[in-house]
Amino acid sequence: MNFRLLSQYHADIKKLIKISLPILLAQIAQNSMGLADTIMAGRVSSTDMAAISIGASIWMPLMFFGQGLLLALPPTISYLNGSGQHHRIAHQVRQGIWLVLGVSIPLGLLIYFCEIPLQYMQMESKMSDLARDYLHAMLWGLPAYLMLINFRCLNDGIEKTKPAMVITFLGLLINIPLNYIFIYGKFGMPAFGAVGCGIATAIVNWAMCLMMIFYSYTNTQERSLKVFSQLIEMPNPKTLKKLLRLGLPIAIAICCEVALYALTSLMLSPLGATIVASHQITLNTSSFIFMFPMSIGMATTILVGQALGAGSPQNAKKIGYAALLLGLTVTIVTALITIFFRYEIASIFVTDEIVIAMAANLLLFAALYQFSDTIQMVVGGILRGYKDTKVILYITLFSYWVIGVPLGYTLGRTDWLVPHIDAKGFWIAFVVSLTFAAFLLSLRMKKMQAMNDNAILQRLEKLK
């Protein structure tokens, strides 16, 4: 480890940790809610547990899309905060409310008519009905969840990431007893089973939304921004267009990534339960570890945007390198843990020795994959700070769908290049496609950073 290099970026790394740690803990709390739903529904029946899994496979991509649109706000708000244009922040948040209302309608309709795709999944009618009713219950919390994200983006943009962490943990504490009441039928309530998870989640989303709004209303710094001084602000087409121009590529890129992993599971399903189980264990482990670089990437967006708003592209560049140094340092630790404890990690999920052995083998690829994943997440965060999001979409589409999917299918399911190697082939493809993405995004980052300072600032002024 180059300790001289660490000391050079010490202040920036310290600030990145301060901002990213609450984001990480909030993500862990959010994922814990899904885990609690699965475990508690599983105690009713395997059908209820499966219904939640199926419902989540429809719900999550749609929520990621809505959330991706709103991720245009943190770089916008952090830029305005850094440039001292605090009076313009409230307008962005109010227009974010219109964005929430606008996207909630099509997403809500897709969820309401979820029975159509469920019919094509060839499952038991009881499971299909439970998944539909679970999604319909979740639907009531859709606007609240997106509104929560809108006000979370306000707080993130001004470097206040702790409120979301605290509120998400409070949501987890509310979620578990509500699950208990609605799933098992306690305190006079009927036993809803899997549907009870949907009811509980909808209530929790509203509770967290109201807590976040209350915090934003009462916090001294945010009151000075006068977000709530005007109850109704009409939609501003110019502002909404700018937010969509930033947010839509992020939303589509996130959906493409989610769809890639979903499609991989489908392509592996004919190969048998053992292979699918080993793949799922590796995917679940990688998804947990992914929260580390994702949190650093989100913190990087905030600090890079703020530095650029303050008129200091050189400081933004320095923050970017500090974020990469921090991300790769964390990745060395997580990769070593993955390698040396891969059998223990696999045994957390199953007791079948064959599945454990297969998963342990795949986790070696997952350890390698973490380095490329970290680089592409952190560099993506840097580019979002520069409000350069279209390129992220193009690179994601090319790397995942032009390279990743065909290569994974060729190696995993055919004998065209080598005798088919099942799940291992798809994980090799993940490593290759993410490495391409990391490389191409890094080239774009270098190009942005090589621009003349005035050219960078003029470009951002046009986008603000």
Swiss-Prot record:
GO cellular component, one term: plasma membrane
Spans through the membrane: 16-36, 51-71, 96-116, 134-154, 164-184, 194-214, 248-268, 288-308, 321-341, 348-368, 391-411, 423-443
Keyword terms: Antibiotic resistance, Antiport, Cell inner membrane, Cell membrane, Ion transport, Membrane, Sodium, Sodium transport, Transmembrane, Transmembrane helix, Transport
Subcellular locations according to the entry: Cell inner membrane
Keyword Cell membrane listed: yes
Membrane topology recorded in Swiss-Prot or TrEMBL: Multi-pass membrane protein
Main localisation: membrane
One Pfam family hit: MatE
UniProt-listed GO biological process terms: response to antibiotic; sodium ion transport
Single GO MF annotation: antiporter activity
Family designation: Belongs to the multi antimicrobial extrusion (MATE) (TC 2.A.66.1) family.
Function (record text): Multidrug efflux pump that functions as a Na(+)/drug antiporter. Confers resistance to norfloxacin, acriflavine, doxorubicin, ethidium bromide, tetraphenylphosphonium chloride, daunomycin, berberine and sodium deoxycholate.
Stated name of the protein: Multidrug resistance protein HmrM
Native species: Haemophilus influenzae (strain ATCC 51907 / DSM 11121 / KW20 / Rd)
Lineage of source species: Bacteria, Pseudomonadati, Pseudomonadota, Gammaproteobacteria, Pasteurellales
